[in-house]
Amino acid sequence: AERRQYAGGVSNGSIGFSAMDYALKDSVGAAGISARKFWACYGDVVVCLVANLQAKNLHEPVYTALDQCRLQGPVWVNHEMQELPMGDHHLQNVQWIYHAGFAYIPAQPSTIDLQLKSVSGSWTTINASEITTPLQDKILLPVLRHGSLPASFAYALAYAKSAKDAKKLSAKPTWQILQNDSVCQAVSFPDGTVMAAFYAAGKIEAGKKTQVQVNQPCLILLQKDKLYVSDPKHSGSSVTITINDTSLVLTLPADGTTFEKQVQQEK
């Protein structure tokens, strides 16, 4: 196993995001997987970014499970008038999936394996002290398949009243991916809110009037005249953040908690 230093989050109490430099290796370190991962929560939407996904000495396909839950009604994919039957489905060019009030929306049309079926198991398989009685239930399990690596990708999980609304949200998302690579993962929302995870010194264009630059790794949430920052490396060091022409030097808490600062943005 491998534990990297970079992990943290930022919140203003109602919205926020988490990010981490993720790595997983086998017991001898011969095989493993790594990626930069980012989850932004804003209203009824969670935007998920994965950058620089890499695998070493793996002989099985690499995939991301978008969800795994009890099946709670009909499932629609790309067409709001056509329900998907039970079974194992290998789906190409997926733009959206709708189930039980939720829309699953990949940033680009994607290949997804979707399980709609009954499965069985027992709690004792994950905890020896639990009961051995077999349990059975129907599940929904959408799995995003990845092709050649390294790769970067994104998807969103959003509340939607109907399959028709899921289709509309896929066509006109309420979020914009500003950057998704090994240096920075960032998204913005219609009110100008920006959430950005910097893994190194860098700069992003966050709309026509906002430019954000940092001199070292940090997590930033910018909403109107408030800046929220944290230190994902938990070092307690100072960071210089430049918003347009205004530079701020901030000493961040070493425990990774959010630091709040009033800022003045161009109108």
Model-based region annotation:
Residues A1-G87, Q92, G101:
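Catalytic and substrate-binding regions of extracellular carbohydrate-active enzymes
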Residues R4-S11, W39, H89, Q95-I97, ...:
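Short, exposed beta-strand/loop patches in secreted or surface proteins that constitute
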